[in-house]
């Protein structure tokens, strides 16, 4: 069965400290055709010097209107059948892109394909796992954005139809995008495999702007109807869907997967073929 090609878009701004891990993780993917596009926002920390070392990259460094704008610029340049974004401080796990491509080939009806991810610290050491479940629009709206964007790809046909990120969202752009796609009737397919690693550090936008994250999340819920109830009713529905989510993870065995991963807390998961991190990374990806 022929596999679809992939395009990875990496938005970057003064992220030279971590960007090489992201580049290497895409570069070393096997058995899948992938292009890597880096949209840099005019960094001054040596990012462009790093990018010049990799002739296979497509990249541009110029001012932008933020992360969503940079991702949209990259999406418009993408040639792959599937398009996703990988933030400059995150990285893919061995075989992750092949798993996405294979799932897309086996499920041509799927518009969005997503998998699981790991949370790591600034040094790439495992902090926790994020194991998910099959898509449920109600859980998305009442529990919150449980789909890890770093482990998600979209059919290019969505991009070509003009469905891009909303640049008004600076933190919850992924939540708004998923909610909009679900509201439009798009099909989501879950791959029960670790696809990527999300780096948890003090400068991470998703973690450092709690007030804005709460505001944008509430805005999405209002826009798509989850907040049409009283606050008390909304809290009850949120608790109900949190329990529903947990039940799904127990029934599918994904809680057991999370517990197995805990045995490797603190180990290096970066794509380093010259040390033990490679073995750790490869073994975790298959769990």
Mark where each language-model region is.
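Cell-envelope/extracellular polymer assembly enzymes that use nucleotide-activated donors
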Residues: 4-7, 35, 176
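Conserved nucleotide-sugar donor-binding catalytic segment
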Residues: 9, 129-220
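Acidic helix N-cap motif at the loop->helix transition within catalytic regions
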Residues: 17-20, 45-53, 95
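Short, acidic, metal-binding catalytic loop of nucleotide-sugar glycosyltransferases
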Residues: 24-33
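A conserved acidic beta->alpha catalytic loop
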Residues: 25, 40-49, 63, 87
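Glycine-rich, basic loop-to-helix element that forms the pyrophosphate-binding segment
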Residues: 62-78
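Short aromatic/hydrophobic "clamp" motif used to bind/position activated sugar donors
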Residues: 83
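Conserved donor NDP-sugar-binding/catalytic core segment of glycosyltransferases
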Residues: 91, 95-127
């Amino acid at each position: 069965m022929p596999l679809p090609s992939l395009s990875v878009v990496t938005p970057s701004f003064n992220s030279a400290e971590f960007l090489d891990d992201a580049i290497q993780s895409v570069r070393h993917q096997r058995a899948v055709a992938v292009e890597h596009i880096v949209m840099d926002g005019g960094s001054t920390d040596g990012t462009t010097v790093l990018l010049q070392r990799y002739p296979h990259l497509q990249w541009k460094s110029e001012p932008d209107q933020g992360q969503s704008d940079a991702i949209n610029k990259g999406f418009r340049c993408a040639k792959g059948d599937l398009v996703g974004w990988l933030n400059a401080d995150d990285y893919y796990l061995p075989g992750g892109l092949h798993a996405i491509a294979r799932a897309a080939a086996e499920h041509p009806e799927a518009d969005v394909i997503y998998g699981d991810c790991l949370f790591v610290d600034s040094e790439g050491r495992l902090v926790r796992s994020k194991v998910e479940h099959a898509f449920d629009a109600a859980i998305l709206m009442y529990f919150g954005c449980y789909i890890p964007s770093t482990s998600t790809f979209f059919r290019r046909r969505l991009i070509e139809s003009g469905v891009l990120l909303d640049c008004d969202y600076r933190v919850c752009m992924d939540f708004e995008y998923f909610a909009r796609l679900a509201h439009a009737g798009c099909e989501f397919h879950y791959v029960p495999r670790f696809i990527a690693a999300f780096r948890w550090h003090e400068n991470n936008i998703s973690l450092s702007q709690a007030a804005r994250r709460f505001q944008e999340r509430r805005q999405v819920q209002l826009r798509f109807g989850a907040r049409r109830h009283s606050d008390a009713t909304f809290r009850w529905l949120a608790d109900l869907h949190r329990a529903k989510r947990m039940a799904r993870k127990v029934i599918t065995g994904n809680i057991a997967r999370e517990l197995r991963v805990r045995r490797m807390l603190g180990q290096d998961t970066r794509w380093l073929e010259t040390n033990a991190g490679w073995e750790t990374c490869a073994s975790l990806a298959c769990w």
